[in-house]
């Protein structure tokens, strides 16, 4: 029996449909009388241990315990997936061999492999790489099963990412949260290997905008008349001339006006202007590449305002409908063995009236081989394209329709000719000044024809460059019109979801070490195609950023956390290098263990920075009357109370009164000499549920006792002799009380008699 394990139920059902007649069972589908069985995970059904599950002492956040580095990494089954895990485990026992049908990327590889490792599987495992779920693609993939061992590097890469994220997140989040609480802040400070430098991009962009000072500068535009037509030009500055700033902008309007007067005067006196340079080059622009997930997310964000997460979710739905290929692809190229599908896909487009695809598909040439067809650029998956399954546009949602059309048109562009144009540069000399004009003449529209009916985007207006008349060097022209143009520099734009995702992908532009930037240019950025959208959504959910209209703006909390982190955390240099290392683990260049050893060394350095950071005290919090540090609101077993942030050196506490510490109650407190649990003093407290006695060490001991006539009732449990009796009201009978063991030893409850336990 072959056992297929898919990433999630919808994908499992899609695979099963292509294997034969199936019968649905609990957590699986049997095909061909049990010869094949398809089961599935629910995404990751295993999760990392929390620190407190490695060691009880880690349940408390203590700086001296850091770093926490597991000697042996452990996973546990998620509670909600326990039943499905058991089903998978039992099915593996019956299987002759297993087929890993996880998504064709490093996370999909790990997702299935970690389950097989957890159950101790010894059966042979094959790997199926499904880039699409239509019948033809599934049948082809079934005929090309690989040995799962060939993908150990891919699995280890995902495992390295997971464990590195745990080390950074668990340790640095604890360290900075402890420091922030010492300063009087109450929220958890999350630190993420990718999340934090991504947040820093937003914070730094906001700071650039706030500190931006506009600069007014001037340019001189002159239109010249040639016998064959007009030539628009811009004045070329001389590098050593007066009035230029460090970026070669002319800041003096007087100089600009003087230049214009100089040209006009020369023209009025009959001084000729002459063409001194004519450069003409025939240029070609190859077909645009099909989309990867990130390039689609950027385009859909720009054009339709869709968030990266919306794009990912929508493309996932189209994939599961078998209409488009695997969505989480970082590739923009196509394998040559899929060229045979082109005629079918183009024929299907002949039925799509939207965006004129039917019209354009009629003129497409499936014999054209664009630069996108390149096997050398293909790894586990290829660019996003339509499958051979015909689409009924009427059945698609608005978002599905928009994204399908974007993907389809980019695919269609591969079967149109190259775009050809002639670029012309003209330089005109007059009165010892030079003016340059650039023109463009379209020779063959080619693939750009299918984008012509779109509204031109302001960032893609090459075709709108002027068409210059036929000219030659030495031709004389005359001055027609001149204008001094005032220009004002503008601040950088705030990020949108789409442009932030693009920045994550092009992270080499944002590293601090500019020498490193060049080497990272080929790096795939920080995060992955599958995770970037979730990281941006995570920043919103953590309230580190908010959205104003479509733009991302950092919150006060977002600014604060970036301000306290060292550059090693907030700049993407280190994270980008880690991503490059993960790629090297995937291709077998470096082993997992050496990567993790390196991460621990980096972590120790980052923890040293965290321990030495000086955070500004939260001035909004009350001050401890005994040591001068801030008081923090805490949750105790009997309700909220205020404790000194200097604990354990200072053990000052106070009850909460309408959100503030009530220090006046101390004058009314009654004390006894000794807490029977720890030996410290007991004090009487009047809480909202009545009067009781509590150990003064509310964080360390927190023993409590009932009050009877202004004295604590200290009675050992007669059942175990260890715990102490506590008083509680019966849930079944209002006004009736009973006593139970504080250690919950299981002894029968004792009924209350006049405020005391009714003991024999």
Language-model features and meaning:
Residues 184, 203-251, 303:
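C-terminal helical "lid" subdomain and adjoining coupling/linker elements of P-loop NTPases
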Residues 2-3, 81, 118, 173, ...:
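Basic, low-complexity terminal or inter-domain segments flanking catalytic cores
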Residues 137-222:
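C-terminal or mid-to-C-terminal helical accessory/interaction module adjacent to the motor/catalytic core
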Residues 1-3, 99, 103-104, 185-188, ...:
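Conserved short loop/turn motifs at secondary-structure junctions
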Residues 1-170, 491:
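Intrinsically disordered, low-complexity regulatory segments
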Residues 51, 94-99, 139, 232-251, ...:
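OB-fold/S1-family RNA-binding modules
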Residues 244-289:
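Metal- or metallocofactor-binding catalytic centers and their adjacent structured scaffolds
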């Amino acid at each position: 029996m072959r056992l297929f394990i898919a990433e999630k139920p919808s994908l499992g059902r899609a695979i099963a449909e292509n294997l034969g007649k199936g019968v649905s069972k609990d957590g699986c589908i049997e095909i061909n009388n049990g010869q094949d069985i398809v089961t599935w995970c629910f995404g990751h059904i295993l999760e990392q241990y929390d620190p407190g599950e490695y060691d009880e002492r880690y349940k408390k956040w203590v700086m001296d315990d850091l770093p926490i580095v597991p000697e042996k990494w452990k996973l546990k089954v998620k509670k909600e997936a326990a039943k499905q895990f058991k089903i998978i485990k039992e099915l593996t026992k019956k299987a002759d061999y297993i087929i890993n049908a996880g998504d064709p990327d490093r996370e999909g590889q790990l997702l299935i492999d970690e389950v097989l490792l957890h159950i101790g599987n010894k059966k042979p495992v094959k790997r199926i790489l499904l880039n699409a779920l239509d019948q033809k693609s599934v049948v082809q993939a079934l005929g090309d099963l690989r040995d799962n061992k060939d993908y150990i590097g891919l699995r280890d890469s995902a495992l390295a990412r997971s464990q590195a994220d745990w080390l950074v997140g668990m340790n640095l989040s604890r360290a900075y949260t402890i420091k922030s609480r010492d300063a009087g802040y109450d929220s958890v400070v999350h630190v993420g290997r990718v999340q934090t430098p991504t947040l820093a991009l937003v914070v730094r962009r906001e700071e650039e905008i706030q500190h931006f000072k506009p600069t007014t500068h001037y340019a001189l535009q002159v239109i010249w008349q040639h016998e064959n037509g007009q030539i628009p030009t811009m004045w070329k500055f001389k590098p050593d001339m007066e009035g230029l700033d460090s970026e070669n902008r002319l800041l003096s309007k007087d100089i600009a006006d003087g230049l214009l007067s100089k040209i006009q005067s020369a023209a009025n006196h009959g001084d000729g202007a002459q063409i001194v340079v004519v450069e003409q080059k025939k240029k070609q622009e190859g077909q645009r590449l099909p989309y990867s997930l990130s390039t689609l997310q950027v385009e859909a964000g720009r054009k339709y305002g869709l968030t990266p997460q919306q794009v990912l979710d929508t493309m996932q739905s189209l994939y599961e409908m078998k209409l488009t290929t695997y969505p989480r692809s970082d590739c923009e190229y196509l394998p040559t063995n899929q060229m045979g599908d082109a005629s079918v896909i183009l024929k299907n487009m002949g039925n799509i009236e939207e965006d004129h695809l039917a019209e354009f598909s009629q003129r497409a040439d499936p014999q054209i081989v664009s630069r996108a067809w390149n096997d050398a650029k293909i790894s586990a998956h290829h660019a996003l394209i339509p499958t051979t399954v015909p689409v009924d546009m009427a059945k698609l949602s608005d978002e599905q329709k928009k994204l399908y059309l974007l993907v389809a048109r980019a695919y269609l562009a591969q079967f149109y000719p190259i775009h050809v144009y002639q670029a012309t540069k003209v330089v005109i000399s007059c009165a010892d000044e030079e003016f340059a004009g650039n023109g463009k003449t379209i020779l063959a529209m080619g693939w750009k024809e299918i984008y012509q009916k779109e509204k031109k985007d302001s960032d893609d207006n090459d075709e709108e460059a002027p068409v210059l008349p036929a000219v030659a060097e030495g031709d004389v022209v005359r001055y027609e019109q001149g204008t001094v143009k005032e220009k004002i520099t503008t601040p950088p734009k705030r990020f949108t979801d789409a442009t932030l995702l693009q920045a994550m992908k092009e992270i080499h532009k944002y590293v601090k070490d500019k020498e490193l930037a060049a080497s990272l240019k080929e790096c795939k950025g920080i995060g992955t195609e599958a995770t970037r959208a979730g990281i941006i959504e995570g920043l919103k959910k953590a309230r580190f950023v908010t959205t104003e209209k479509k733009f991302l703006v950092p919150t006060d909390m977002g600014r604060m956390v970036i301000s306290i982190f060292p550059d090693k955390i907030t700049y993407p240099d280190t994270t980008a290098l880690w991503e490059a290392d993960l790629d090297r683990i995937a291709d077998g260049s470096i082993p997992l263990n050496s990567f993790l050893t390196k991460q621990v060394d980096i972590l120790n350095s980052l923890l040293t920075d965290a321990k030495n950071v000086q955070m500004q005290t939260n001035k909004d919090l009350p001050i401890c009357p005994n040591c001068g540090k801030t008081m923090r609101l805490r949750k105790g077993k009997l309700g909220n109370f205020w404790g000194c942030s200097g604990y354990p050196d200072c053990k000052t506490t106070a009850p909460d009164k309408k959100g503030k510490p009530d220090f006046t109650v101390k004058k009314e407190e009654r004390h006894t000499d000794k807490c029977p649990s720890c030996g410290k003093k007991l004090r009487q407290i009047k809480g909202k549920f009545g009067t009781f006695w509590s150990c003064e060490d509310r964080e360390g001991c927190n023993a409590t006792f009932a009050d009877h006539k202004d004295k604590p009732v200290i009675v050992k449990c007669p059942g175990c002799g260890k715990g102490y009796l506590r008083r509680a009201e019966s849930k079944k009978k209002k006004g009736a009380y009973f006593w139970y063991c504080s250690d919950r030893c299981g002894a029968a409850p004792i009924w209350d008699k006049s405020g005391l336990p009714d003991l024999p």
